[in-house]
């Protein structure tokens, strides 16, 4: 919501002890088109931030906060291209695209308080639910309670 604006913010530094972070402004890169990736990402943000939920919400397209510090990109290609082009930026793409294109990604702290990387095992942990409770073909499995769950998952 624009509360952390530089990479060396004390809250980021506390999560990265011993890492020299630049005193540079953060530019966020988001999807400029509607996408399921945006829905899953904003659904997660809505679950972990009541501020995000009340002001932005979860959808395939949203009005991104702090627009002056963000750049839009069409599709995974546009987002990844802008992240690579714009210094000190961060964005989101689907895991398969990141893996196929050898993009860097981060660990996230999940609901259980554990820092995990996105991979097959953390996706499996997130999807380890009672599927009988979810009629239909899709379920949002963001921020699941499993100890090793990747927090931004969908099935």
Describe the residue ranges of each PLM region:
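Flexible loop/hinge segments at secondary-structure junctions
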Residues: 1-155
């Amino acid at each position: 919501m624009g509360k952390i604006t530089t990479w060396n913010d004390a809250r980021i530094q506390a999560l990265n002890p011993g890492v020299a972070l630049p005193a540079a402004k953060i530019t966020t890169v988001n999807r400029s088109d509607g996408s399921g990736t945006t829905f899953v990402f904003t659904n997660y943000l809505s679950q972990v931030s009541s501020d995000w939920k009340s002001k932005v919400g979860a959808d395939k397209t949203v009005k991104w906060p702090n627009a002056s510090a963000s750049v839009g990109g069409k599709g995974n290609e546009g987002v990844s291209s802008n992240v690579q082009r714009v210094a000190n930026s961060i964005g989101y793409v689907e895991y398969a695209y990141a893996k196929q294109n050898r993009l860097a990604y981060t660990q996230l702290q999940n609901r259980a308080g554990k820092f995990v990387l996105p991979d097959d095992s953390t996706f499996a942990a997130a999807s380890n639910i009672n599927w009988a409770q979810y009629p239909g073909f899709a379920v949002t499995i963001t921020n699941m309670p499993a100890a090793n769950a990747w927090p931004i998952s969908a099935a």
